[in-house]
Amino acid sequence: MMRQPLTKRPRRSGIIAGPNQHKALFRRCGLPVANRASVGALLMTETNQAEQAPVSRRSAKEWVLVLANYREPSTFRSVFELAATLVPFVMLWGLAWASLSISYWLAFAIALLNGVFLVRIFVIQHDCGHASYFSSRTAQDWVGRCLGVLTLTPYDVWRRTHSIHHSHHGNLDQRGIGDVLTLTVEEYRARSRVGRFLYRMYRNPVVLFVLGPSYLFILQNRLPFGLMNKGWRYWTSAMGTNAVIAIGVGLMIWLGGWMPLLLIYLPTSVIAATIGVWLFYVQHQFEETHWSKTEDWQLHEAALEGSSHYVLPQPLRWFTANIGIHHVHHLYSRIPFYRLPEVLRDNADLAQAQRLTIWESFQSVKLHLWDEKLQKLMSFREARRLYGRV
């Protein structure tokens, strides 16, 4: 199946990379999925009526050539952003510790606030894993490993599994590592009653956003899951990170007892993990995302169509280090996070593409199954309405 160049998204007035994103307009107009000519004519009519700018005809692959112009990091800027994140993080840690002698609740509140700085630390580690943060690979690998101790994430393990996520995202035949488990309607219906129950439990918001983040970062990250038989490098990364974490926690308890661990360290880590999992979820789990079989899957189209542009107010963009500009990041992961706004500034089509508001992101929690026929993510309720018992 040949995919079309970028065109306007009917619902959010952005751009897309292929027919996958026309589904909302297909359904609204009662057109069959295969009738692309009618949809193209309708899109042109709506565009003219709205007096919008001409549609970009760049394909997703052509956008890669444009984005390559933004890949060079600035060493000064990278060091500055790292310092602007670590210094407040350390200061708030110290303030929370000092507050233990005044009020446990005050220390706990400061620890929760510090969680947003830990999110930013994780995104910097994330950029190091993509080799986008410094010109020196050695420098960014060691910065990433050190930050991984703070984020409870073994750097080399995460770098590899995240690379797999980027390489296979949106491919229905390559699920399982570095993504949120997503079943198709047919796969879900084919499962046993126990299997369906377990999937419903997994997709429950309490499991995904309350229990899951703590399990992932505090427990699962202690072993190189997914890479257990892939060599010593990943075991060294996991065990080395664990050893440094254990030394740090031991010193913390020795110096201050259990309260710093229970009221500062764990709350900061848990709130950061929760925010991180939420961000990852909304970056790929939205109604008009992209999934396809290997024979129809194309890397660049899947990157652009299957990743959202999470529209956040400026303070949240800073704390999350622009990770919400995820459609651009997935299309060209070598761009440092602080240069992503430049991309949107210079390319209005990308600025309007794949937009997901905060309100829309809350609605995405209700979506559970991928419908291969309608090419959209849907809720259990909608699947039941369309296909009977699920």
Language model feature labels by segment:
Residues 277-318, 357:
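Membrane-interfacial segments at transmembrane helix termini in multi-pass membrane proteins
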Residues 3-14, 21, 26-117, 124, ...:
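Non-catalytic, topology-defining segments of multipass membrane proteins
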Residues 87-91, 117-121, 271-274, 320, ...:
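Residue-level signal for transmembrane alpha-helical positions in Major Facilitator Superfamily
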